[in-house]
């Protein structure tokens, strides 16, 4: 809802307007999405009449999205990308009590004794970010990449546990809440029963069901699914202060937000271990799926001192339970050819349920792994889901063998193009199809790869679409993708109607391809399918060089100097660029209008060009991510290790051993005030003045 310009409107009238808008929007949502009517027609009409009269009396109150200016039934989810007010971090994992103890020991080293621990079951659901302004739910966003997610506000509002308005005392002006959307197991069973009855495939597990239900374009579909939600943290906020995590949970519950009834605060690691053990034994007694226990330092001041890494808070950890294991029959071993030519064997299994999912295939990684595991086609094998996610064959049940089993023989030629397979290097454990230019499998996988969220994120470009475009001959390879036209798609049955015109799905593909031309350079680099270059390396290259042209002109030594890149990735980039048709892909994309350079913010001075900065300890004015970004945006290199090549070490509270090492090596040490001066003025701003000569 747009902000109302109060002007000369009396506060009583403004508050009544806000109340009327909230009631009408709630009634519309219930009617058009939930198919329920909390108000009679007469009551609803009376509210609208009062709102219109109030806006006639005070025109300043009338906004473009007021109920008097909009049609009631226009509720749809477009999945637009939205920035999180505060980044959604992940959690580091512990898979044993030893790893949990090591984490607790690090906490004690950093903050001393006295930390208390909040324990809660780790829900296996879909992370969600809710934003409330003046107590009113204004946005619901999926986690996405932690910085940005998809707007699913209308869908979230259908979830039974999500309050549209916070109630109670001291509701904050602004509140970002983190939680998990999931299914109770009985709700999941009911959904699947309905799908089977309707002749549709059931969901594999409750988490997939939750994700699929929340990402419906029509929120009326989401409203039919019995989704639940629990909150487990807060992000950005104004008007809410708390000293403990458990105290924050109490406030959230008092305002009407659902928190877990199983949260427990304990004083010792032994009590944490007991909590973990209890839910490990009773995980299937919980009404929803859990895959571990989350342990957090309860005291907020200690959380601040501990800080965060680039991906996870240091004051929290997820203890992951051992994955479930089952036995089933290994029906066959087949191979898959990936986008870089890697040939990977996979197991074809008698379908079996493990960790809540039905598994029919599992990875075997490579031929050496098949030999190491000792599995034969026809074996009874032990299957688990590593991390409760990726199916994996552990090995055979040897005593169940009948003698009819047979060994798997790795093919010597590509199953898709017939090219002889080979190791790319003598020490390469994988065999590859060297026909990267025209192998149908590699072409298909590379085109499909561009659809991924880590690359160009192109909707309507699934694996079937990639295959159809190549089979129809409208593209020769990924280089042609961004020049597709409607005339091209007329020749692709997948994208045409019975009348021979381009379908809505085809038009959506073209629109998506057009929109995705304007992407950060790192996404373009990922999209090129250069071996070893994933999002992390691509970001480092984009930060270091800024443009594709600069990368093309760089030597292997230049590329290896980018932080986190090194000689292996540098060699892969140089080798890739040495291939003519690879450079043709870059040329085609450039000519099609794909952005090949990042625009640098010229307003930020490049005061740290060529400098390596280490920040250690907690700073009052910067989070760790903010300090790193401040260094990178000014041309510097942010490092986590102190060496003779370090230019400056910035020391905050609880700095630890890095400050001592800096002094031993003679590296200049700055406090936070010095860091700010360095950012603004460069090395000259923090240089010690020479002593003035004595007099007399």
From Swiss-Prot:
Cellular component GO terms, alphabetically? Answer: cytosol
The record ties this protein, via SMART domains, to: BRCT, LIGANc
Q: What class of enzyme is it?
A: ligase
Identify the EC number(s): 6.5.1.2
Which residues of the sequence carry a binding annotation for Zn(2+)? Answer: 414, 417, 433, 439
Q: What domain of life is recorded for the organism?
A: Bacteria
Q: Which cofactor does it need?
A: Mg(2+); Mn(2+)
Please indicate if the UniProt record lists Metal-binding as a keyword: yes
Residues of the BRCT domain: 603-692
Among InterPro entries, the record links this protein to: BRCT_dom, BRCT_dom_sf, DisA/LigA_HHH, DNA_ligase, DNA_ligase_AS, DNA_ligase_CS, DNAligase_adenylation, DNAligase_N
Active site residues according to the UniProt entry: 122
User: Could you tell me which CDD domains the record lists for this protein?
Assistant: BRCT_DNA_ligase_like, LIGANc
**Reaction equations catalysed:** NAD(+) + (deoxyribonucleotide)n-3'-hydroxyl + 5'-phospho-(deoxyribonucleotide)m = (deoxyribonucleotide)n+m + AMP + beta-nicotinamide D-nucleotide
Q: According to its UniProt record, what is one Pfam family this protein matches?
A: HHH_2
Q: Name one GO biological process term.
A: DNA repair
An MF annotation (GO) of this entry: DNA ligase (NAD+) activity
Q: Which UniProt keywords apply?
A: DNA damage, DNA repair, DNA replication, Ligase, Magnesium, Manganese, Metal-binding, NAD, Zinc
Sites where the protein binds NAD(+): 41-45, 90-91, 120, 143, 180, 296, 320
What HAMAP family does the annotation carry?
A: DNA_ligase_A (MF_01588)
So what does this one do? DNA ligase that catalyzes the formation of phosphodiester linkages between 5'-phosphoryl and 3'-hydroxyl groups in double-stranded DNA using NAD as a coenzyme and as the energy source for the reaction. It is essential for DNA replication and repair of damaged DNA.
Stated family: Belongs to the NAD-dependent DNA ligase family. LigA subfamily.
Protein name, entry field: DNA ligase
Give the species: Kineococcus radiotolerans (strain ATCC BAA-149 / DSM 14245 / SRS30216)
Q: Which gene encodes it?
A: ligA
């Amino acid at each position: 809802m747009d902000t109302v310009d109060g002007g000369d409107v009396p506060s009583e009238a403004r508050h009544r307007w806000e109340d009327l808008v909230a009631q009408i929007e709630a009634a519309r949502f219930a009617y058009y999405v939930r198919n329920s009517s909390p108000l009679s027609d007469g009551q609803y009409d009376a509210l609208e009449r009062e709102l219109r009269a109030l806006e006639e009396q005070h025109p300043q109150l009338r906004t473009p999205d007021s109920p008097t200016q909009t049609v009631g039934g226009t509720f749809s989810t477009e999945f637009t990308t939205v920035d999180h007010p505060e980044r959604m971090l992940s959690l580091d994992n512990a898979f044993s009590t030893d790893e949990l103890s090591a984490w607790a020991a690090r906490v004690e080293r950093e903050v001393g004794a006295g930390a208390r621990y909040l324990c809660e079951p780790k829900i296996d659901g879909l992370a969600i970010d809710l934003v409330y302004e003046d107590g009113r739910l204004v946005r619901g966003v999926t986690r996405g990449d932690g910085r940005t997610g998809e707007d699913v506000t209308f869908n979230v509002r259908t979830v039974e546990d999500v309050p549209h308005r916070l109630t109670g005392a001291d509701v904050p002006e602004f509140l970002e809440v983190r939680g998990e959307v999931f299914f109770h197991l009985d709700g999941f069973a009911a959904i699947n029963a309905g799908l089977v009855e309707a002749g549709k495939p059931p969901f594999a597990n409750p988490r997939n069901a939750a994700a699929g239900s929340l990402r419906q374009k029509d929120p009326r579909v989401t409203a039919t699914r019995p989704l639940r939600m629990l909150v487990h943290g807060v992000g950005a906020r104004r008007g809410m202060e708390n000293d403990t995590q458990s105290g924050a949970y109490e406030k959230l519950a008092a305002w009407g937000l659902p928190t877990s009834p199983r949260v427990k605060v304990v004083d010792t690691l032994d009590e944490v271990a007991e909590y973990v053990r209890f839910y490990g034994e009773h995980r299937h007694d919980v009404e929803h799926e859990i895959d571990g226990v989350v342990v957090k330092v309860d005291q907020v001041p200690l959380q601040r001192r501990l800080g965060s890494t680039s991906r996870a808070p240091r004051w929290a950890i997820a203890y992951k339970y051992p994955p479930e294991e089952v036995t089933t029959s290994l029906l066959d071993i087949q191979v898959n050819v990936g986008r870089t030519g890697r040939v990977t064997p996979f197991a074809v299994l008698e379908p079996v349920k493990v960790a809540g999912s039905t598994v029919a295939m599992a990875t075997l990684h490579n031929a050496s792994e098949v030999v190491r595991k000792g599995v034969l086609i026809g074996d009874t094998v032990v299957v688990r889901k590593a991390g409760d996610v990726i199916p994996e064959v552990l090995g055979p049940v040897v005593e169940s063998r009948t003698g009819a089993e047979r060994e798997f023989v790795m093919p010597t030629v590509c199953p898709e193009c017939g090219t002889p397979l080979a190791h790319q290097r003598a020490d390469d454990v994988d065999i590859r199809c060297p026909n990267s230019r025209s192998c149908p499998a590699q072409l298909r996988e590379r085109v499909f790869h561009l659809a991924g969220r880590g690359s160009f994120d192109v909707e309507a470009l699934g694996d079937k679409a990639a295959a159809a475009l190549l089979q129809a001959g409208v593209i020769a390879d990924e280089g042609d993708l961004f020049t597709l036209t409607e005339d091209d798609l007329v020749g692709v049955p997948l994208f045409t109607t019975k009348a021979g015109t381009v379908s809505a799905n085809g038009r959506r593909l073209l629109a998506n391809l057009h929109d995705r031309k304007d992407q950060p350079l790192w996404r373009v680099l990922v999209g090129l399918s250069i071996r070893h270059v994933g999002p992390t390396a691509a970001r480092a290259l984009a930060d270091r060089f800024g443009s594709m042209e600069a990368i093309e002109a760089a030597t292997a030594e230049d590329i290896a100097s980018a932080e986190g890149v090194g000689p292996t990735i540098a060699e892969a980039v140089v080798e890739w660029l040495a291939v003519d048709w690879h450079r043709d892909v870059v040329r085609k994309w450039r000519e099609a209008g794909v952005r090949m350079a990042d625009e640098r913010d010229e307003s930020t001075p490049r005061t740290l060009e060529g400098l390596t900065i280490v920040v250690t300890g907690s700073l009052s004015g910067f989070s760790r991510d903010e300090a790193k970004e401040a260094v990178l945006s000014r041309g510097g290199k942010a490092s986590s290790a102190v060496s003779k090549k370090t230019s400056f070490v910035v020391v905050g509270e609880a700095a630890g051993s890095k400050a001592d090492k800096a002094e031993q090596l003679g590296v200049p040490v700055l406090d936070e005030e010095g860091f700010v001066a360095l950012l603004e003025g460069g090395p000259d701003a923090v240089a010690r003045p020479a002593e003035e000569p004595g007099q007399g």
